[in-house]
Amino acid sequence: MAINNAQAAIRNAFIELYKTRSIDKITIEMICKKSYLSRSTFYKNYRNIDAVAAELENEVRQEMIRINNDYNYQNIFDIDSNCPSPNFVEMFRCVLRYKDFLTGAFSDHGNPSFYFRSKVLTSEFLKSHILSHYTTVKHIDLICDICSDYIINSCKMIIKYENDLSPKGLAIEVKKQVVDFVTNEELYLMGDENKDES
């Protein structure tokens, strides 16, 4: 998405303010002061503060959808956790790229609907690709729900603690945890539909 200099300044100002306060506590005056722009310049580019937030949320969401759609069907739950799929790595690269915005979006004062939509998107991604590799999946909805929570919470921790791992390193660490959960808990993936589920 192409943005002009004024939009970039407005977005950057919003992101900085969003780190410490909720969207409803951010005013146009604050944005203008931090970006050194006039109110008229703000209104030439955005209808209101919510429009700035929505643009950034949609940008992140569309990038995640693109990454998911480009998935090459390498199994994310392969036991060899040292070889995460390229798109799993790309997901964490995206998280790091939008780290400043996600600091606010995934915080306690962030937009709950953005967190929920991110979780649904991640869960749907996991479900579609698990089913492409396993004939029978026991408790798949619960598995995907828990794993998507874990992945998003891992993203939050990465952002909060300024994790210095590379995108691949982050993907490896998170994948190990997900694989451990899937293979060691009662909620597990079954590769053979004829196996006894008792």
What are these regions (language model features)?
Residues 5-28:
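Short, amphipathic alpha-helix enriched in basic
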Residues 8-16, 34, 51-71, 86, ...:
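Alpha-helical structural segments
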Residues 9, 41-43, 101:
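Residues in the helix-turn-helix
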Residues 20-51:
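Helix-turn-helix
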Residues 69-100:
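Hydrophobic alpha-helical connector segments
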Residues 89-119:
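Amphipathic alpha-helical segments used for helix-helix packing
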Residues 109-134, 142-149:
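Amphipathic alpha-helical packing segments from all-alpha helical-bundle domains
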Residues 138-161, 168-181:
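Hydrophobic alpha-helical segments that form the core
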